[in-house]
Amino acid sequence: MSDRQAALDMALKQIEKQFGKGSIMKLGEQTDTRISTVPSGSLALDTALGIGGYPRGRIIEVYGPESSGKTTVALHAIAEVQQQGGQAAFIDAEHALDPVYAQKLGVNIDELLLSQPDTGEQALEIAEALVRSGAVDIVVIDSVAALVPKAEIEGDMGDSHVGLQARLMSQALRKLSGAINKSKTIAIFINQIREKVGVMFGNPETTPGGRALKFYSSVRLEVRRAEQLKQGNDIMGNKTRIKVVKNKVAPPFRIAEVDIMYGEGISKEGEIIDLGSELDIVQKSGAWYSYQEERLGQGRENAKQFLKENKDILLMIQEQIREHYGLDTNGVKAPEDEEGQEELEF
């Protein structure tokens, strides 16, 4: 053994003695290097994300204009986590969560942890406590724009508080990022958009809360309404475009188009028809849609209704789409920790 190797071994032993076993290791020594995921609740979004869902132990930012479907996207993720037996928490800084709508999306509201904090500091401290417990699989913060610093709440209306929220987010994310990775918790931050004053060229839109969230996020999703979905003169929902603006775990800039129906959330039938047609799993002849020898219906809405009534055919098409994109049909679960759900050491 060379002197350099002996010196390195001694340094590694010293680090492990001081900071604990596993504090430093060779990258190839990790037992499972695959990124563990949770399905997003939308097959189109799972394929756009490139790994079959949201990566565990990472920060996700979902932003877009008002009423574009940001909270709907987050609630679908909560429903998926709960279906896998996981624990979910929703920090409602906007004080606007509709439990009836959440239930319609498949969220078990009896098991969902809900907090409606008074200040931004309180919201982020609650989020940190939940993450550090190691017992929560997903935490949703709705929204960053509503995380008002305590100094601003206690001050007068006209007072200037320049950069307070950005400083709060920067400090919180420095503390949270390591804990989120260690506990394998998915942290979804919902954000609004603002317009910068005096921008003549380029995109004037920005997100509140400073730049820290942009840096710490592994995935950033931009949610926008593309068009209204009508049945006769009645508006039934919106065609929504979700763009993966940033992705550290797969190639970015992919786009998922989904139907968000009022009172129902993301239409699984709509995205199955669209993805199936793209891959020629579902055949389209004129206005008719068919699968193998089975006619699904004339027109997209009739085909959606047929799949809603015939779940076995829906699941068969879904499985073929997942196989084509190399996605796990059941979603990938995080490896079980030997210590179970005991509080993590940080």
Curated annotation (Swiss-Prot):
Keywords: ATP-binding, Cytoplasm, DNA damage, DNA recombination, DNA repair, DNA-binding, Nucleotide-binding, SOS response
InterPro entries: AAA+_ATPase (IPR003593), DNA_recomb/repair_RecA (IPR013765), DNA_recomb/repair_RecA_CS (IPR020584), P-loop_NTPase (IPR027417), RecA-like_C (IPR049261), RecA-like_N (IPR049428), RecA_ATP-bd (IPR020588), RecA_C_sf (IPR023400)
Molecular-function GO terms, alphabetical: ATP binding; ATP hydrolysis activity; ATP-dependent DNA damage sensor activity; damaged DNA binding; single-stranded DNA binding
Gene3D superfamilies associated with the record: P-loop containing nucleotide triphosphate hydrolases
Sequence positions that bind ATP: G64, P65, E66, S67, S68, G69, K70, T71
Keyword Cytoplasm (UniProt): yes
BP GO annotations: DNA recombination; DNA repair; SOS response
Places the protein is found: Cytoplasm
Single GO cellular component term: cytosol
Main location: cytoplasm
UniProt cross-references to Pfam families, sorted A to Z: RecA (PF00154), RecA_C (PF21096)
Entry annotated with the keyword Transport: no
Task performed by this protein: Can catalyze the hydrolysis of ATP in the presence of single-stranded DNA, the ATP-dependent uptake of single-stranded DNA by duplex DNA, and the ATP-dependent hybridization of homologous single-stranded DNAs. It interacts with LexA causing its activation and leading to its autocatalytic cleavage.
Family stated for the protein in its record: Belongs to the RecA family.
Record NCBIfam families: tigrfam_recA
Listed name of the protein: Protein RecA
Organism: Bacillus pumilus (strain SAFR-032)
Lineage: Bacteria, Bacillati, Bacillota, Bacilli, Bacillales
